[in-house]
């Protein structure tokens, strides 16, 4: 009878217990490799051939960063103007040196007929320049009268504006009245320039002031008559203008 210990000669003892064995993915892969069989996983998808549309040429040109807008559209659009078509800056501001020169010549020559279309414009470039020049010449003569010059100019324009609206059939704007009275202030600037070099408090100064007042009032009334079509009323318009320019003459002489 064979001895049972005879069968234990070729074995060694270990702590491995067959009941504690758990299936693992490595073991399944190992057995799969051995037997040439592998179970398909749930995440794997059967590969499908690419659709033939992917190999067709696309209409997209490959211009990634080019804006979608068309420059030809903006260049042909009538709402977009180029710099060549824009008016000059002086024209946009309403400054016309040709008209300023014509108005100045009209004031300097009281006998010259005035152009009503030009004189009816609201141009304040020349009047502001002449008001500043009058104040500067008075300052050079030792008379700081800027406040009086600007104050009497504003009040005088309001009075003449109200008077002309009552006398004329067609109304006149305040800017037009201020423009005409300001341009006709040029002879008064010449009188104040003479006061810088010699005193006007005498017979010569008084006669010069009366001449300048007549000059300014006749020029202003001539322009108003031409612009407002008030024939035969020049003396009625010249009288209030003479009162206004008389105040400026008093500032200049005294």
From Swiss-Prot:
Cellular component aspect of the GO annotation: cis-Golgi network; endoplasmic reticulum membrane; endoplasmic reticulum-Golgi intermediate compartment
InterPro entries assigned to the protein according to its UniProt record, in alphabetical order: Yip1/4-like (IPR045231), Yip1_dom (IPR006977)
Tissue specificity statement from the Swiss-Prot or TrEMBL entry: Specifically expressed in the heart.
Pfam families for this protein: Yip1
Its membrane topology: Multi-pass membrane protein
Residue ranges that the Swiss-Prot or TrEMBL entry lists as coiled coil: none
Protein name, entry field: Protein YIPF7
Organism per entry: Mus musculus
């Amino acid at each position: 009878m064979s001895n049972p210990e005879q069968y234990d000669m070729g074995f060694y003892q270990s702590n491995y217990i067959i009941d504690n064995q758990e299936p693992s993915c490595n073991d399944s892969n190992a057995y799969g490799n051995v037997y040439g069989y592998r179970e398909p996983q749930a995440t794997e998808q059967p590969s499908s051939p690419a659709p033939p549309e992917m190999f067709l040429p696309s209409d997209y040109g490959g211009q990634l960063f080019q804006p979608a807008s068309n420059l030809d559209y903006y260049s042909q659009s009538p709402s977009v103007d180029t710099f060549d078509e824009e008016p000059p800056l002086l024209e946009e501001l309403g400054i016309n040196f040709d008209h300023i020169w014509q108005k100045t010549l009209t004031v300097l020559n009281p006998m010259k007929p005035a152009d009503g279309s030009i004189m009816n414009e609201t141009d304040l470039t020349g009047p502001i320049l002449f008001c500043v020049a009058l104040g500067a010449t008075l300052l050079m003569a030792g008379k700081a009268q800027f406040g009086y010059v600007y104050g009497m100019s504003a009040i005088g324009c309001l009075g003449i504006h109200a008077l002309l609206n009552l006398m004329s059939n067609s109304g006149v704007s305040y800017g037009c009245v201020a423009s005409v009275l300001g341009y006709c202030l040029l002879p008064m600037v010449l009188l104040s320039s003479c006061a810088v070099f010699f005193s006007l408090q005498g017979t010569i100064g008084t006669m010069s002031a009366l001449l300048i007042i007549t000059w300014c009032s006749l020029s202003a009334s001539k322009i108003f008559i031409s612009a407002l079509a008030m024939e035969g009323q020049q003396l009625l318009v010249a009288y209030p203008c003479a009162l206004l320019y008389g105040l400026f003459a008093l500032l200049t002489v005294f």
